[in-house]
């Protein structure tokens, strides 16, 4: 049986998502460091509230005192980092409302899944979805801390496995002050 149309696109994107999600929540354990680990620089927020490390081939720019945009030189990956006020509700209630909010924001939204990852800041929600018409895989990570939360959004084109892996390394490098 041959899949056609939207079903084919969704199937391909869901497979691509698996790579992005694994890159975000699981470290790569190899005897040799990956190319992305070869050299890294660190971006520190203007108010010094957080920092992230990023590999060669990425550039970081400040967005005000509490945000950053990190983008690959070839534009095949981007990570947005924003400091937010402390969460008022639980992580589970946040995840419950997220699909509805994202469906309003992105007409081609297709949810893939949610999980919890352990970052240096503590437990974080990882919510991954595809945008079928845009052929993008997107992951939102919400990392609460005692005084604030940090939201990271990683976006990569379907099939950009190296960009997804590097975006995952950036997310996992988050440190909050």
Segments from the language model and where they lie:
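Hydrophobic membrane-insertion alpha-helices, especially the h-region
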Residues: 8-25
């Amino acid at each position: 049986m041959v899949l056609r149309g939207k079903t084919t696109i969704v199937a391909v994107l869901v497979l691509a998502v698996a790579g992005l999600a694994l890159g975000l929540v699981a470290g790569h354990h190899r005897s040799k460091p990956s190319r992305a680990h070869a050299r890294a620089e660190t971006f520190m927020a203007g108010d010094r509230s957080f920092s992230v490390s990023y590999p060669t081939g990425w550039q970081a720019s400040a967005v005000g005192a509490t945000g950053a945009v990190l983008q690959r030189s070839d534009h095949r990956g981007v990570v947005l980092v924003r400091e937010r006020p402390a969460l008022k509700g639980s992580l589970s209630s946040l995840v419950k409302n997220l699909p509805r909010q994202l469906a309003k924001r992105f007409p081609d939204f297709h949810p893939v899944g949610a999980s919890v990852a352990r970052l240096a800041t503590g437990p974080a929600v990882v919510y991954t979805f595809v945008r079928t018409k845009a052929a993008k895989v997107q992951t939102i990570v919400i990392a609460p801390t005692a005084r604030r939360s940090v939201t990271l959004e990683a976006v990569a084109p379907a099939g950009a496995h190296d960009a997804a892996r590097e975006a995952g390394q950036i997310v996992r490098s988050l440190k909050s002050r």
